[in-house]
Amino acid sequence: MLYYFLKYINDIYHFPALRVIDYLTFRASAAAITALLITLLIGPKLIAYLKQRIIEPIKEEAPPEHRKKKQLPTMGGLLIIFAFELSVFLWAKVDSPHVWLVMVAVLWMGAVGFLDDYLKVVKKVKGGLAAHYKLIGQVLLGLLVGLYAWFDPSMAVLRDTTTVPFFKNLTINYGIFYVPVVIFIITAISNAVNLTDGLDGLAAGTSAIAFIGLAGFAYLAGNAVYATYLNIPFIQGGGEVAIVSMALVMACVGFLWFNSNPAEIIMGDTGSLALGSAMAVIALLIKQELLLPLMAGVFVLETFSVSLQVLYFKYTRKRTGEGKRIFLMAPLHHHFQLKGWAEQKIVIRFWIMAILFFLASLMTLKLR
């Protein structure tokens, strides 16, 4: 909204200084700084409020070191969501579907996560919101995004062919499978981020790194010259997604101020599901959904460790009568906890892995 106001003032009075409002880099930086300041200013008040009302119990199955931690207020994802929504509302073109689809995704899955946290912490419902209800929420969001892209003529490029990373002339046409693909990606990534949210600063830090990568690709995809040169799909209006992504980056960084070890608050499903859905929708909007598993490699590894653990346990129990495990505990970060690694060391090493995945995704721009 601030963008429209400043543009209106500039159109009337022609202030040279206000011309910067037309530059994506300026508005992306402004949105990022705004999101950071909002989290830093509101964070202490939200933490104080939630400490009196919303305390997350430590799971019984958690590693011994994890159970020693003091109980913390949850639903910290509300801070991320508020900072993101307000900064984007101020600096982005909110009438663009590339912007409001991400805003809706964050609000929608944030609401699903909030309900889960509320049931677990306030109503003391073991397990919180049933898994199939979460799945319904994810599927409904996927249907909204997929069907809107399918029927809106301005977004026709999204449902057409997409490029394949590492292959210069290889493309895939989803055809009638576009909407199911959208549903799968949103469900998979939102669950992956949710699984990763198990240590102080882990999900927020790795998410911030992934959003930096998405911001870069969004900026390139929104520029016809860069997109053509780099052989990636050109997305008309896709540059606005860079503003959205940078707001998410700094909302996560601001949250890390309070969530780094020892954490004062945790994001809960309110934050993890919102961040995961935003990551998926952004990748879909800039036609980088096939690159997302690499860019979000840490989340993929965490999910893979859980799937592999469950499948191997069931397989060995069926074959031998006794289930065996590959990892000491899944997701993967708990495996390293049980091996005696300090929590800070696990988190920082996972951040380093996230940076490596981010750099590898950048390499695909030329390795084609």
From Swiss-Prot:
Pathway: Cell wall biogenesis; peptidoglycan biosynthesis
GO biological process: cell division; cell wall organization; peptidoglycan biosynthetic process; regulation of cell shape
Membrane topology: Multi-pass membrane protein
UniProt keyword list: Cell cycle, Cell division, Cell inner membrane, Cell membrane, Cell shape, Cell wall biogenesis/degradation, Magnesium, Membrane, Metal-binding, Peptidoglycan synthesis, Transferase, Transmembrane, Transmembrane helix
Catalytic activity: UDP-N-acetyl-alpha-D-muramoyl-L-alanyl-gamma-D-glutamyl-meso-2,6-diaminopimeloyl-D-alanyl-D-alanine + di-trans,octa-cis-undecaprenyl phosphate = di-trans,octa-cis-undecaprenyl diphospho-N-acetyl-alpha-D-muramoyl-L-alanyl-D-glutamyl-meso-2,6-diaminopimeloyl-D-alanyl-D-alanine + UMP
Keyword Protease part of the UniProt annotation: no
Keyword ATP-binding among UniProt keywords: no
Cited Pfam families: Glycos_transf_4 (PF00953)
Predominant location: membrane
GO molecular function, one term: UDP-N-acetylmuramoyl-L-alanyl-D-glutamyl-meso-2,6-diaminopimelyl-D-alanyl-D-alanine:undecaprenyl-phosphate transferase activity
Cell location: Cell inner membrane
Enzyme Commission number: 2.7.8.13
GO CC annotations, alphabetized: plasma membrane
Listed InterPro entries: Glycosyl_transferase_4 (IPR000715), PNAcMuramoyl-5peptid_Trfase (IPR003524), PNAcMuramoyl-5peptid_Trfase_CS (IPR018480)
Membrane-spanning parts: 30-50, 72-92, 99-119, 135-155, 170-190, 201-221, 238-258, 265-286, 345-365
Named cofactor requirement(s): Mg(2+)
Function as written in the Swiss-Prot or TrEMBL entry: Catalyzes the initial step of the lipid cycle reactions in the biosynthesis of the cell wall peptidoglycan: transfers peptidoglycan precursor phospho-MurNAc-pentapeptide from UDP-MurNAc-pentapeptide onto the lipid carrier undecaprenyl phosphate, yielding undecaprenyl-pyrophosphoryl-MurNAc-pentapeptide, known as lipid I.
NCBIfam families linked to this entry: mraY
Record-stated family: Belongs to the glycosyltransferase 4 family. MraY subfamily.
Name of the protein: Phospho-N-acetylmuramoyl-pentapeptide-transferase
Protein species of origin: Chlorobium chlorochromatii (strain CaD3)
